[in-house]
């Protein structure tokens, strides 16, 4: 009886240790899945700029079989839901949207981190004025590229490094907006709301005008965290990724904000 009582006393701390070890392993596994370990060495050699890549693509969809590598710093975040399964990088010459096809990309590729993309086996094309890189789209698709989807495929083509340099938005006036800035983080100031969805909320397309009457649209996904928030009626300054598309039958430049805070009161 005394021996059995001693084993029970020993078993309790042993069980506690085993539980603690299992918890630690579980947390480690989750951490490894959520965020790939960044490379500590210098980034692999980039041999083509994003601007040059855009020139190569033009209005076509191109599938690459050459060992081309681009790189840039992450300029977007899906934390508030206005970006969905994609993120953008900028190398100082141009911007490109990466069709990752994964959720919680702000954990995998945080804003400001340096990422390289190996283009061999990828496709590139332009959608809404923005250069996109992903996989080859199906023949029946209306889009130039498709998502990577698989984490294995993403890791084959993308590498994130421990180099951090947040990209400042390019300050532009509405009349300065041009195709060369599409896919890049820009800021436009002194804008006044002239049209908004029913209820004056962000969800959908809002139209703003500057003091000269030049107009620009702002897009917000219905699933964004701030979609149901009211749009400010004061003059504002708005930061976002520049796109181009049809809004209410009119070809317009469009800003796609990352956060609700990308719209601030302009003084």
Regions found by a protein language model. Give the residues of each.
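C-terminal motif of bacterial Sec signal peptides marking the signal peptidase cleavage site
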Residues: 26-29
């Amino acid at each position: 009886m005394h021996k059995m009582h001693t084993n029970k006393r020993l078993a309790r701390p042993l069980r506690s240790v085993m539980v603690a070890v299992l918890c630690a392993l579980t947390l480690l596994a989750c951490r490894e899945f959520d965020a790939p370990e960044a490379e500590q060495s210098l980034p692999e050699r980039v041999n083509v700029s994003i601007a040059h890549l855009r020139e190569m693509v033009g209005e076509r969809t191109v599938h690459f079989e050459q060992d081309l590598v681009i790189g840039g710093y992450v300029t977007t975040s899906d934390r508030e839901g206005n970006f969905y399964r994609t993120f953008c990088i900028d190398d100082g010459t141009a911007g490109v949207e990466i069709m990752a096809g994964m959720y919680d990309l702000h954990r995998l590729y945080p804003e400001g981190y340096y990422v390289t993309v190996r283009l061999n086996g990828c496709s590139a094309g332009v959608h809404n004025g923005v250069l996109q890189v992903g996989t080859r789209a199906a023949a029946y698709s209306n889009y130039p590229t498709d998502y990577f989807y698989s984490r294995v495929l993403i890791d084959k083509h993308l590498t994130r490094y421990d180099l951090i340099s947040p990209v400042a938005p390019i300050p532009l006036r509405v009349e300065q907006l041009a195709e060369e800035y599409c896919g890049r983080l820009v800021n436009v100031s002194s804008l006044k709301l002239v049209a908004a969805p029913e209820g004056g909320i962000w969800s959908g397309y809002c139209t703003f005008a500057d003091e000269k009457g030049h107009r620009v649209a702002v897009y917000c996904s219905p699933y964004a965290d701030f979609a149901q928030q009211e749009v400010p009626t004061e003059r504002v300054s708005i930061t976002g990724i520049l796109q181009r598309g049809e809004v209410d039958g009119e070809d317009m430049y469009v800003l796609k904000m990352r956060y609700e805070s990308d719209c601030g009161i302009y003084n």
